[in-house]
Each structure stands twice: as C-alpha cells, then as structure tokens.
C-alpha cells in the first residue's frame, strides 16, 4: 500500500487537546471539594467522561492554580490516562513505571519500576466487595498482569506466576504471534476483565478475538470470535476457514459496559489487509461492527455492521456512548457510535433496533482484479459531521501558484468521494481519511441530557495500491516465510512495501551493497 497525506496546512479541521492536571486552590471556595473517584478509563464503564461537579464554572476557571507537580515523562509522548480511587492517583511515569501518588499532595506512595511495554493509554482498578483485595490490572507487552493497588507489588497468584499470555487461544501457534498487546486497558464487569487487542493489521497478524478473564485467577472465562468459526453466526460472510489466516478484526479502542443490563458493546476494527480484500471476499462479519454481548457469558445479543467488506480502514475507533433519548414521546435507552467516516448510528441498547433510520445506498465497484467491493453501504440519516470529497477549492490559498497547480493536477488525476475503492491505476483521495472523523478518544456524553459530544477532524489522505514483490523472487524458498513475517511485522510500515523507503526511512533494496553487515546489525 502506497500512502500519502496532504501537507499539514491542508488539514481542514484538526483539534488538539492538551491537558494539565490541576487541583483547585482551597481558598478559592468556601469549603474543601468533595472527593470524586475516577476509577475507570473514561470515568466509568460507560466511557462517558462525565462527572457531576459544580465548583469549576466559567466564572472561576481563570482562578485555577497548580497545586503540585509530578514529572511523568522522561522523553517522548505519554498518552496515559490516570485513574483516581479515594485519595490515590495511579499514573504511568519515570521510564515506564507505574506510580501511586497522593492526589491532594502529589507525594509518591509507591513505584513499580521498569514496566517496559506497559500499555501507554491506561489501566484498570478492581476491588472485592469487602475491599480487602484491591488490584490494578495492566497489560505489559503480550501479557496481562495484576498489581496490589495498596503496595505496588505484583500478585503472583494471578495467571501463571503473575502473568496471562494473551497470545494463547487465537487459532495460531502462540510462539508465532509477535504482537498481541492491547492498546487499551480493557473494561471491567463484576469480576471479569474484558480485553480487546492490537495484533496489527497487516498480513500474518493474529485475529482479534475478544476475551474475558477472571480478575482474581487470570482464568479465561469466555471468547468471542470476531472472525467466526465453522457453525458460528457470520461464518458464511467469509471464505472457508478464513479464521485460520485472516487477522485483525479486533477491538483496539474503548469498549463500553451497561452495568445494569450486563451488556458490553464492542467497536470492532477492520480485517487484514486494511485496503485490499480479494482474499476475504464477503461482508466479513464482525469486522467494522458494533457488537452487543452478554458481558458474563460472551454470547452475542445483536450486531450492526457500519462498513461492509472494509477497504478504507474505517474501523470503529470511538467509544460507544450510552444515552437516554426522548423519541416520539417515548424514552429509549440507546447506544450511539460515531464513525471515522463521519456518521452517527444510534440503536436500542437491548434489541439493536436503529433509533434513527439507516439506508443501504449503492457505491462504485472495485477495478482491482479479484476484488469484490460490497455494492451497498449503510448510511445514517442523521446529519453527517465531516465532508467526503476533496475539491480544488480546498487547497490552501496561501500556497504558491506552482504548489497549487501541482495539487490541482493531482486532484484531477485522482478519484475522491465516499467509499471509492483503492486502485493500482490511480490515486484515491479519502476524506475524512482513516485518521479522521471520530477516532480514538473523540466522543463523550452527558447521560442525563442525552447529549453526545464528538471531537472530529478531517485528514485528507492519498492512497494507491502497489503490487508487492514476492519474497520468492528475492530469496531462497526455505527462508521465504520467515523473512516475510519479519519484514511485515518489523520493517514494512517505515521502509515500504517493496523496501523502497518512505520519508526519513531509507530504502533497503540495495542495502547489502551499501552497508557492511556489522554496521547494519548495529
């Protein structure tokens, strides 16, 4: 896949959030603020990011003061979302260490050092009903681990000597799976930790089955096959035995739980490969689906597929949001999902019936040999929140005339529009693009008012399919399989499909002639 992006100045609507941890100076108010727990990623199992507080208002927000400071990052980026229970804040800091901090003073309570490979977006907190057992559930590389929340020590009775290997039980030899770590902390329901995964979205990636583990023992309690096995619902939407070789179709983002009903909602990603599906002809359930499961058993209750046979990497990346709506004089407990391609789909939480009509509309076929783009796609009748076609009038007016002309010619030669399949004959310009729309962390809700909030961006991206040279053309037959796996999993994203190089990553085609082995190794 050849991928290009418009220059940064042509990005149409990108919002960047920068957060500062602050505590209100007590002398600003009449009394000490009431402690509010933030014990789940997203604030609650519902991922609403909502809490009731009246102390910070438009009138006094300018009086916020930094109460304490704790350095969290040695270098680079940190996407970690802290959680707060009672007066303790848990945060990733100091070279991939997990730290407990007193939330009122900033004083360090304990540190569990050097957790290289710790999920960089968050952790889970669980406690027994008597509160005698309090633990943090974390993922480190391909494992799940448990840490005592009060002492910071590893709980060795969890799993196998303190570890649960997430590579096991995935229709593949575990040792052949390089990457299975979840990018997100998962979600808790009662004594179950429900986990998604990020196995990668290239060939040789593992399938992204969703699994639930006992938080005390680490025992696997249930598995939902996102690529169905024989006899399971949706198996016929794939070629025979697709679960043995197709990967992805994973939940890499935020899952949501309706704790009262015991339902977990899964926003499932696209199958491998993101932009080419000739080896996975069919609608490809449960790729790109919002799926409702019985949280205790993993049994499917209902599903809705937002993109059939995805060729655009329009996986579901935002958290499903739980809302109570008034519709035609009737209260409806609903779940809403906002998509990368700019639509909002709303369903009855229990039945899966659409609250607002959804239409199946026709779209262009693919011109690629063997590819079978799905003839229709579901379109919500609610207003979309992004544009879908790049036109010449969108080019940055401050570009030089020469630069404008270059882009005018490129737009004329390309195809742009919603659900235009990628091709190897011309460029396809996607808008809002695979990085746009409602992406990871981009939705929130006010459950009481029935309000859904979406942070959206438009990220026009240029794609063109390239034929990838077979390793058989370059290597001896005995090393082909191993070499393809190594390059795909470790090198391809930066150095290109055919080792041609991308951006600052150099080409590797003639590396053997240009670089001595010892230099290359180092």
What are these regions (language model features)?
Residues 45-51, 75-79, 99, 274-275:
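Short, solvent-exposed loop/turn elements at domain surfaces
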């Amino acid at each position: 896949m050849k991928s290009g992006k418009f220059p940064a100045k042509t990005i149409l609507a990108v919002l960047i959030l920068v957060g500062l941890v602050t505590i209100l100076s007590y002398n600003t108010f009449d009394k000490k603020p009431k402690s509010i727990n933030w014990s789940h990623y997203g604030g609650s199992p519902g991922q609403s990011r909502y809490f009731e507080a009246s102390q910070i208002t438009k009138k006094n927000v300018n009086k916020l003061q930094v109460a304490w400071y704790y350095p969290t990052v040695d270098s680079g980026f940190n996407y970690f979302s802290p959680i707060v229970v009672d007066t303790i804040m848990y945060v990733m800091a100091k070279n991939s260490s997990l730290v407990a901090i007193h939330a009122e003073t900033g004083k360090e309570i304990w540190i569990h050092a050097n957790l290289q490979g710790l999920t960089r977006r968050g952790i889970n907190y669980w406690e027994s009903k008597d509160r005698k057992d309090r633990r943090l559930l974390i993922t480190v590389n391909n494992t799940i681990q448990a840490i005592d929340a009060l002492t910071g020590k590893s709980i060795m009775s969890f799993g196998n000597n303190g570890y649960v290997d997430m590579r096991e039980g995935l229709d593949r030899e575990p040792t052949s799976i390089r990457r299975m770590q979840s990018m997100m902390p998962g979600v808790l329901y009662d004594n179950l930790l429900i986990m998604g995964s990020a196995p990668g979205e290239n060939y040789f990636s593992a399938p992204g089955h969703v699994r639930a583990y006992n938080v005390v023992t680490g025992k696997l309690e249930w598995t939902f096959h996102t690529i169905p096995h024989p006899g399971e619902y949706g198996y016929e939407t794939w070629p025979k035995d697709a679960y043995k070789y197709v990967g992805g179709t994973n939940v890499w983002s935020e899952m949501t739980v309706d704790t009262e009903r015991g339902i977990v909602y899964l926003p499932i990603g696209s199958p491998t490969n993101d932009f080419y599906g000739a080896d996975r002809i069919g609608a490809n359930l449960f790729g790109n689906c919002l799926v409702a499961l019985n949280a205790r058993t993993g049994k499917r209750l209902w599903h809705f597929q937002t993109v059939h046979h995805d060729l655009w990497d329009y996986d579901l990346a935002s958290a499903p949001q739980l809302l109570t709506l008034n519709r035609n004089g009737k209260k409806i407990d609903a779940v809403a999902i906002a998509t990368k391609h700019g639509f909002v789909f709303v369903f009855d939480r229990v039945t899966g019936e659409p609250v607002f009509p959804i239409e199946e509309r026709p779209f262009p076929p693919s011109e690629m040999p063997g590819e079978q783009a799905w003839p229709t796609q579901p379109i919500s009748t609610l207003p979309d929140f992004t544009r879908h076609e790049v036109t010449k009038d969108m080019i940055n007016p401050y570009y030089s005339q020469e630069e404008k002309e270059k882009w005018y010619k490129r737009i004329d030669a390309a195809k742009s529009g919603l659900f235009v399949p990628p091709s190897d004959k011309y460029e396809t310009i996607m808008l809002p693009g695979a990085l746009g729309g409602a992406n990871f962390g981009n939705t929130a809700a006010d459950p009481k008012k029935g309000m859904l909030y979406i942070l959206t961006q438009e990220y026009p991206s240029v794609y063109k399919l390239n034929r990838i040279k077979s390793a058989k053309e370059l290597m001896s037959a005995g090393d082909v399989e191993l070499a393809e796996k190594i390059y795909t999993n470790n090198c391809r994203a930066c150095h290109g499909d055919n080792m041609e190089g991308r951006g600052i990553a150099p080409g590797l085609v003639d590396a053997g002639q240009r670089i001595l082995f010892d230099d290359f190794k180092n």
